């Protein structure tokens, strides 16, 4: 039940995002600046629509607004049902203790992962979530002038390409929130930036940490402990 409710909620959220992007793209196609969220608000729509000079395009914008209203109306009950069903799974209460995970992400994590025992290690979860590093290596040793020598370190090609997109989005969003929300994760984020590490790499490390701690808390059924930040190195 939880898995299907999660799918329904995620589908609505994705459709809502697409409609919002299409709406802004329509305004931009007429060179109408539309930064921020003001363009979506009901109270300002008539003003925005008046900026479109062509009747056909203006009508298309009205239809996009209708889609936006419908999807926003559907999202709230879908969210409520997802949260209500997630309370039937006791682990969600423990996962909510993890900073930046929250009720919705905890519910989605349980729905998407199903059981933590499908992953023997955090690295398997990283790979499944699109947070694993792919390397390139043709062999550990090679011949140089007839002598066997150890090769140089393998090349890192980037993150793995075959993964669960919803789960990756969940952990990346949690990492983004953790980087701006006061707490232990933000402290780690600021310390890493002070060392000269790029923000994108620090957020990736945060996403991996959050995924690893999620797996540990779920497998052991224990409460979140801030000390896990020290032991769950990414």
Residue ranges of model-derived segments:
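Short coil/turn segments at secondary-structure boundaries
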Residues: 23-28, 36-40, 82, 138-141, ...
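Phosphate-backbone recognition surface of nucleic-acid-processing proteins
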Residues: 94-97, 103, 107-195, 199
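Low-complexity, acidic/Ser/Thr- and charged residue-rich accessory regions of DNA metabolism proteins
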Residues: 136, 140, 144, 188-234
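Short, amphipathic alpha-helical segments that act as regulatory/interfacial helices
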Residues: 6-9, 13-16, 20-27, 110, ...
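Short, conserved alpha-helical segments within structured domains
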Residues: 41-44, 97, 101, 163, ...
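Short helix-capping/linker segments at secondary-structure and domain boundaries
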Residues: 19-20, 76-78, 114-118, 177-184, ...
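Glycine-rich, often acidic, oxyanion-interacting loops/wings at catalytic, nucleic-acid
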Residues: 1-94, 166
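HhH-family (HhH-GPD) DNA N-glycosylase catalytic core used in base-excision repair
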Residues: 36-51, 117, 129, 141, ...
């Amino acid at each position: 039940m939880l898995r299907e409710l999660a799918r329904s909620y995620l589908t609505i959220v994705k459709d809502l995002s697409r409609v919002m992007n299409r709406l802004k793209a329509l305004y931009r196609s007429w060179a109408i600046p539309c930064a921020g969220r003001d363009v979506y608000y009901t109270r300002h729509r008539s003003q925005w629509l008046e900026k479109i000079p062509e009747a056909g395009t203006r009508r298309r914008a009205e239809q996009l607004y209708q889609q936006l209203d419908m999807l926003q109306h559907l999202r709230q009950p879908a969210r409520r049902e997802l949260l209500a069903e997630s309370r039937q799974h006791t682990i969600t209460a423990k996962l909510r203790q993890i900073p930046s995970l929250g009720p919705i992400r905890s519910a989605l994590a349980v729905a998407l992962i199903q059981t933590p025992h499908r992953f023997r290690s955090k690295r398997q979860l990283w790979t499944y979530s699109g947070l694993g590093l792919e390397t390139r290596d043709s062999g550990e040793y090679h011949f140089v002038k007839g002598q066997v020598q150890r090769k140089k370190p393998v090349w890192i090609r980037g993150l793995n390409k075959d993964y669960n997109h919803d789960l990756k989005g969940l952990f990346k969003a949690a990492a983004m929130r953790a980087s701006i929300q006061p707490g232990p994760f933000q402290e780690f984020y600021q310390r890493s930036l002070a060392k000269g590490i790029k923000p994108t790499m620090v957020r990736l490390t945060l996403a991996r940490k959050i995924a690893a701690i999620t797996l540990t808390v779920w497998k052991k059924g224990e409460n979140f402990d801030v000390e896990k930040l020290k032991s769950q190195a990414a």
